[in-house]
Every structure is written in C-alpha cells, then in structure tokens.
Amino acid sequence: MAELSSLAELGAATGNTNTQAAAPVHVQKLDKSGRAYATGKRKNAIARVWVKPGSGKIVVNDKEFATYFARPVLQMILNQPIIASNRSGQYDIVATVVGGGLSGQAGAVRHGISKALTYYEPALRAVLKKGGFLTRDSRVVERKKYGKAKARRSFQFSKR
C-alpha cells in the first residue's frame, strides 16, 4: 500500500473529496414586526423576551426593570448579556416572566435576552456562548424524600 502524506491525498485515494464538514450557518430570525423572540428558563421561571432596535429601555411584566427587580444584583444579572455583547442602549427589550421567585425570574430573563440577541444579531453568538449566557442552567430544587426531613437531611438520630 502506498504511503499517504496528507488528508487530501487520502481523500483523493478513497474518492472522498469533501474533507471538511460544513459549519452551521446562523441566520437572523425575526417576526413580522421586526423583533427577535426567544424564551429563557431558570429554575421554575419561564420568560418570553422580545428584542428590537431602540433606546435601551427594558420592560418586564409591564414595569420598568429597575422597578420589577429592585435589588441591584438582579438588575446586574439582567444587564450581563447586553454589557458582554457591548450593545447597551441599542435595543429595547420587552419580557413577560411567570413562575419561580425573583432570582429565577432574573436568570430566565437573562437567558431569554441572550437567545433573542443571537437571533437578531447572529454574530454575537460566539461572545455570548463564551460568557455562558446561552446555556440553560439546569439546576433545580431537589425533591424531598420520604423518611427524611428534607431532600438530604435526616431526622435526628438518637442512639439510646
């Protein structure tokens, strides 16, 4: 058998000339109004998010986001994907979120904003993926087991 020095020669020898797989092409996904729509999830919260070009206004459940998420930590969580993609003040964001508590809701809106930004501007996908904003945080509360006080905590043990 002849020695092959490269993958191209191997492809030519076997008749397979396409040695490179086609990379997935991400295209812009917009609705009829020119908005990008995405859903985000975190714990028990589900957020529906719409993104369109604008002045940077963020509305959550018909309230200004600073009113709905009063704690600065939650506001920071919401702004993370916008700051990471360097798009602050360029998009108006409208979100409706149901279920869970405030922390889970903030995480769900963040996830939805990240996905909607990638639908509107596919070039941002690499930046947001590297920051971990596109990954769904799958951690949920562990269920309580029978014979235990909580999910893992046992009842107090008395030796005598």
Curated annotation (Swiss-Prot):
Record keywords, A-Z: Ribonucleoprotein, Ribosomal protein
Matching Pfam families: Ribosomal_S9 (PF00380)
Q: Name one GO cellular component term.
A: cytosolic small ribosomal subunit
Q: Which GO terms describe its molecular function?
A: RNA binding; structural constituent of ribosome
Q: Which SUPFAM superfamilies match?
A: Ribosomal protein S5 domain 2-like (SSF54211)
Biological-process GO terms, alphabetical: translation
Q: Which InterPro entries does this one have?
A: Ribosomal_Su5_D2-typ_SF, Ribosomal_uS9, Ribosomal_uS9_bac/plastid, Ribosomal_uS9_CS, Ribsml_uS5_D2-typ_fold_subgr
The family annotation for this protein states:
Belongs to the universal ribosomal protein uS9 family.
Identify the HAMAP family for this entry: Ribosomal_uS9_B (MF_00532_B)
Protein known as: Small ribosomal subunit protein uS9
